[in-house]
Structures are given as C-alpha cells and as structure tokens.
From Swiss-Prot:
This is Glutamate--tRNA ligase. Keywords: Aminoacyl-tRNA synthetase, ATP-binding, Cytoplasm, Ligase, Metal-binding, Nucleotide-binding, Protein biosynthesis, Zinc. Binds 1 zinc ion per subunit. Its EC number is 6.1.1.17. It is found in: Cytoplasm. ATP binds at residue 257. The gene is gltX.
Length: 494
C-alpha cells in the first residue's frame, strides 16, 4: 500500500445530488487531513441508465466545488487506470477474477431466468422464509452446464454464500455490525451480458486501486457482508469501512426536491457559493467538540476526522444553508462579491442583464447592499434601480409615501424644495446630504421621516433599500435631481 487512498465512485445515471456530494466531500477532507490521495472513479455499469452526459455533469459539479481528484478522469495514473468501470470491463479485469472464483468453486454459472427467480422468491415469501435465490444451479454437474450452453442459455455468475454463521464488520463510525449469513443468498457477481455486478466490481476496483478506506453512506451497509466475503474468497486484504449517516429532509422524510434542490449545480444556478455548500454539508453527520458552525475550507481540512462522524441521520435544512450562504457572502470584500456575481452571470447566461450597467457604479452599489445579499441571484433586484432611466415606482410605496391624503402635500413640498436646492449642494457626500435633509425638516417644522421617505421613493421607487444618503451619494447629484424632477412631473403636475 502507498499511504491513505480513498475514492468517490458515483454512478452516472443522473445529476450529482446532495448525498453524493457529502460522500465526495468527506472522502476529500479525509484525504487532505491525512495527506492521502483522493480518487474519482465512474461506476457506469448500469447499462440502461448510465450516460456520458451524466458523467459530464458529475465532473462539472466536482470542478465547481473544487473537490479536485488526484487520480481519475482527465488525471489518470497508468498503474490504476482506467477509471471507468465499463472501460475496465473491456480489458477483461472483472472476468479474470470471476473465472478465478469459479475455478475455486467459490462461484458458479446460473442459468435461471428472471421469471424463475421471481417464482422462487414469491414461494419463499409464502413459506415465510427470506425471499432469496434457492441455489438451484449451485449443484449442476459439468455435463448439465454444458447442456444448458448447448441450448443457448445465458448464464450469470453467482457467488457461493455460507448458509449459516455471522459476518462481523468493524466499522470506524458504527463499531461492530453483525450480519446473519442465513439471510444472504448466492448473489450475482457477473451479469449474463458480461458486465460486473456492483458488489463485485467495486471490490475488484478497490483492491486493484489500493483503496485503504471506504467512506460511504449507510445505505451501502447492507452491501458490506457480500463484499467482505468476496475479499476473503480472493484472499485480499480488506480496506477499512466507515458508513456515514443518511441525510433526510424535514420531518425525517427521504430527501427529495420538495426539501430543496437535489442537483448540486442547481444550487450554483441559484447563487450559492461553493464554500457555503461545502461548509453546510460538512455539518451533516460531522461536528467538532466545540460545535463550531462556520469554517473556511482550510479549517475543514485541518479539523475533519471520521471518528467525529455520528450515526444519527442528519436533517437537511435549506434555511440554515441560506443563512450560511449569506454569512459567507458577508465575509467577502465588495470586490470579491463583484467577481463572484460576474462569474454567476456568465454561468447562468445572464450577461445581458448588466451589459449596460456602469461597472464602477455597480461596485459602489454592491458596497451599499453587501449585508443584504443572501444569494448571488438577489443582486439584480437589490441594485437594478441604480441603473434605470425610468424608475419603477412600487404602487404601495407611492400610495403610502407620496399620494396619501396625509402625506401628499408635504411630499410635494419636500420634492419641489429638493429639486430647487440640491443642484446648488456643493458637497454631495452622504454626511452633507443628511445634514441638508435634517435642516429642511427643521425649517419646515416637519419630521425628518417626512423628508427622507419622499426622497427615497422619488429616486428609487421603493420604501426599502440602502441608506438614503449613501444611495444619493453613489447615484450622484445629476441623477438624483433628475429622478426627483421626474417624480414631481409624474405625481404632482396636473
């Protein structure tokens, strides 16, 4: 063995989902923490569902998350390659070891049809026995097998299981886990098509790729005894196993789209940061002694340990992920947020949304709205009013602030006075503008809010937004005065 070697082995039958990313992340962090190697292997033996497009989506998601692999597609080590199971199948890797097991009489060809096996299992259920294959082909003589082949019957290869006893897994996370061998049937290791079955292929690959630790979800724990028997039959040393807790949705239901996006790249489209998603997923099934919640990637590499993983299911909470994303955005400088936003626009194909926006004005607007951004997709709706020539006046804001019986006369007065005075305001800084507004309120014997609110609605069209005077400073004198005059003409010139 050559040090710690772990692998992430997704099946390209769809998008990379949250559970899969958590598995990849924990393997990656474990490798980083131990100075080991992280291997990416594509398990594409599902002949009907595996697609090249799904494989590309998986690679794209891994690249976005920057879970870089030491070995795998595009970065192959000739000692262990190829990293696609179908390519390995073409080289006869699995057939070689299946034939070895048959030669040792630890496996055998089975000619039973799916319909025959279905009948066996139904009968076992009716007899209140475990619904498993009954071993019909286990004791066929060489002559009987030859006759089956003459008849053109296709055979799978089944592994011979023990009918009694217990298999014990020493799991890093779960401790000793016992399996009753009597519940395990003679399982298929090679399909009739010559494609290896999952349990067989991953054992052969893990051994040949010198995988030292298998970290995976606990939905795979039922596969462990079968895989352990294959290791023993071939005389191979087993890796260490660690089965991580499942991720569930709210209320303990199986995670689905109603709990949030299942595809990782959907989170990218929504404007989540990779650091936020990684930070959040690290908390699903793992924790530190001090219950720290916010981590940098480097901190996760330093602090992660499999021993701190729990066995209770983790609940996926979209609200916490959203909160964490906002925290990560607030930890960035405005320049970094700008760069992330531009990258997001390119990824989502929305470059035209901002192609007429002044870059320096956008950067200044982002400074003002920095603390309100939870998702990158929030940015356009937060800052778009800075760039419009025609203010989009929100109906509620206009009714309440400009046109209500209680406010309209004062609002008209404030806007007309401001349109006349602001062009002569030499210092258009936020501090001076606030002083101007307070002086106007005192002069007219009205409340400061009666000055602030009409100006805000006149120049932005809305009641909420960044600090009024900081916003005015960023817009600049000419645009502020223009907007105020537009509002006067629109709402008060009859």
């Amino acid at each position: 063995m050559s040090g710690i070697r772990v692998r992430f082995a997704p099946s390209p039958t769809g998008d990379l989902h949250i559970g899969g990313v958590r598995t990849a992340l924990f393997n990656w962090l474990f490798a980083k923490n131990k100075g080991g190697k992280f291997i990416l292997r594509i398990e594409d033996t599902d002949e009907t569902r595996s697609t090249g497009e799904s494989a590309k989506v998986i690679l794209d998601a891994m690249k976005w998350l920057e879970l870089e692999w030491n070995e795998g597609p595009g970065n192959e080590n000739l000692k262990y390659s190829p990293y696609s199971q179908m390519k390995r199948k073409e080289r006869g890797i699995y057939r070689k070891y299946a034939d070895e097991l048959v030669a040792k009489e630890l496996a055998y060809p089975c000619y039973c049809t799916p319909e025959e096996i279905d009948v066996m299992r139904k009968k076992a259920k009716a007899d209140k026995l475990p619904p498993k294959y009954d071993g019909k082909c286990r004791h066929l003589t060489p002559g009987q097998r030859k006759q089956k082949e003459i008849e053109g019957k296709k055979a799978v290869v089944r592994f011979k299981m023990f009918g009694s006893g217990t298999t014990v897994l020493n799991d890093i996370i779960r401790g000793r886990v016992k399996f009753d061998n009597s519940l395990l049937d003679d399982f298929v290791i090679m399909k009739a098509s010559g494609v290896p079955a999952y349990n067989f292929a991953c054992v052969v690959d893990d051994y040949l790729m010198e995988i030292t630790h298998v970290l995976r979800g606990d939905d795979h724990i039922s596969n462990a005894p079968r895989q352990m028997h294959i290791y023993n039959a071939l005389g191979w040393e087993m890796p260490e196993f660690a089965h991580m807790s499942m991720i569930l949705g709210a209320g303990g239901a199986r995670l689905s789209k109603r709990h949030g996006h299942t595809s990782v790249l959907e989170y990218r489209k929504e404007g989540y940061l990779r650091e936020a998603l990684i930070n959040y997923l690290a908390l699903l099934g793992w924790s530190t002694e001090d219950s720290q919640q916010i981590f940098t990637i480097e901190e996760l590499k330093q602090k992660f340990s499999v021993e701190r993983c729990g066995i209770s299911p983790s609940i996926f909470d979209p609200a916490k992920l959203l909160w964490l994303n906002g925290e990560k955005i607030r930890s960035k400088t405005p320049q970094q947020v700008y760069e992330l936003f531009i990258d997001w626009l390119k990824y989502t194909g929305n470059e035209k949304l901002t192609e007429t926006w002044d870059v320096e004005l956008l950067k200044k607007a982002l400074i003002l709205e920095h603390d309100k951004i939870k998702l990158l997709k929030d940015i356009p709706s937060l800052v778009d009013f800075f760039f419009t020539k025609n203010v989009d006046y929100k109906e509620e804001a206009v009714k309440k602030t400009l046109l209500s019986e209680k406010s309209k006369d004062i609002a008209k007065l404030v806007l007309i006075e401001s349109a006349a005075r602001l062009p002569n305001q030499l210092d258009f800084s936020a501090i001076s503008l606030e002083q101007y507004a307070r002086n106007l309120a005192a002069e007219k014997n009205i409340k400061t809010g009666q000055v602030f609110h009409p100006i805000r609605v006149a120049i932005s069209g809305r009641m909420q937004g960044p600090g009024l005077f900081q916003m005015m400073e960023v817009m600049g004198k000419e645009d502020v005065v223009r907007r105020i005059n537009v509002a006067i003409n629109k709402f008060f010139q009859k």
